[in-house]
């Protein structure tokens, strides 16, 4: 079981690294051919990447209340959805403030989630020096979230999503870019010093994604192909059917069994986003903005629910 789980985790890790690397390469090619100001190809790639990531948060009830009574499960889902709805209203009503709050929540959640993924892998490996979380967590979380939103390409991206967010940083864009970049470079140095070369590679790839890919692609690809994939791998250790699959060596089936139950959430997210966007002038831009709002809103209850899972993985 432990050896098979390690194989699954390493495959997912390779997938996330390759996906982000391809996103960087694709961004460079398309930016050169179509221009960095062309948004159509960016929105298409971003929507696909977001679609890959949305199902991972739809299994929170199965992990939190694995054997609960139907009434308790229904109550949990109602409260979960209610919190998300309140978050949607908050983000739409207070665009900038809500955006900043979600950014910090996402950065913290992403960093802790990545460290938890690595710790689960470390538990199944021998002779590995303990990960320096004080450097890895902030670097892994803040790099893919903040850098894409303060670099030179962020203005056009934010304008296409919601013009009200363009100046969210209140003029401190250069300081944020410098601080996060320097800290991540320092964290990479710490990883190399500790001989955590794979973690150093992870941070290098994330730093390149944040600096070289358009903001929409940087966030969406990270969310869907990195964070969501690694979170789903961790879910396979908590879902009985997945554990059974892993024990039997059926790793693909184990992973798919952690994804399929979340597909209705994917459909629901795009249906809700589409309905909210119907009143907009530009369907593509309005739809994408509403899809992001729904995803960000779901982060609020999702982060609260997965805190227990993260805490267990980090101990």
Which positions does each model-derived feature cover?
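Membrane-interface helix-loop-helix junctions at boundaries between adjacent transmembrane segments
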Residues: 66-74, 78, 85-147, 160-163
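Alpha-helical transmembrane segments of multi-pass integral membrane proteins
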Residues: 104-108, 113-116, 132-155, 173-189, ...
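Short, hydrophobic transmembrane alpha-helix segments
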Residues: 26-40, 279-283
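C-terminal ends of transmembrane helices
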Residues: 3, 55-66, 110-122, 185-195, ...
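Hydrophobic, membrane-inserted alpha-helices
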Residues: 23-27, 79-88, 182-187, 200-209
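N-terminal membrane topogenic signal
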Residues: 1-20, 131-132, 259
């Amino acid at each position: 079981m432990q050896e098979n789980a390690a194989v699954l985790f390493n495959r997912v890790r390779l997938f996330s690294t390759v996906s982000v690397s391809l996103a960087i390469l694709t961004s460079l090619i398309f930016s050169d051919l179509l221009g960095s100001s062309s948004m159509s190809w960016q929105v298409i790639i971003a929507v696909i990447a977001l679609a890959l990531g949305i199902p991972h948060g739809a299994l929170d009830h199965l992990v939190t209340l694995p054997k609960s009574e139907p009434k308790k499960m229904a109550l949990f889902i109602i409260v979960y959805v209610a919190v998300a709805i309140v978050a949607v209203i908050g983000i739409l009503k207070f665009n900038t403030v809500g955006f900043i709050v979600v950014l910090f929540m996402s950065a913290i959640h992403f960093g802790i989630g990545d460290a938890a993924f690595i710790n689960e892998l470390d538990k199944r490996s021998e002779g590995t020096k303990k990960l320096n979380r004080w450097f890895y967590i902030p670097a892994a979380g803040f790099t893919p979230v903040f850098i894409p939103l303060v670099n030179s390409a962020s203005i056009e991206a934010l304008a296409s999503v919601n013009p009200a967010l363009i100046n969210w940083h209140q003029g401190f864009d250069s300081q944020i870019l410098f601080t996060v970049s320097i800290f991540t470079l320092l964290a990479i140095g710490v990883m190399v010093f500790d001989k955590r070369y794979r973690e150093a590679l992870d941070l290098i790839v994330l730093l390149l994604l944040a600096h070289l890919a358009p903001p929409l692609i940087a966030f969406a690809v990270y969310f869907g192909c990195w964070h969501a994939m690694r979170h789903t791998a961790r879910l396979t250790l908590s879902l009985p059917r997945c554990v059974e699959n892993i024990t039997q060596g059926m790793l693909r089936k184990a992973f798919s069994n952690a994804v399929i139950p979340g597909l209705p959430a994917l459909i629901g997210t795009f249906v809700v986003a589409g309905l909210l966007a119907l009143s907009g002038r530009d369907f593509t831009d309005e739809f994408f903005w509403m899809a992001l709002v729904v995803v960000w809103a779901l982060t609020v209850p999702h982060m609260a629910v997965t805190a227990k899972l993260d805490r267990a993985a980090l101990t």
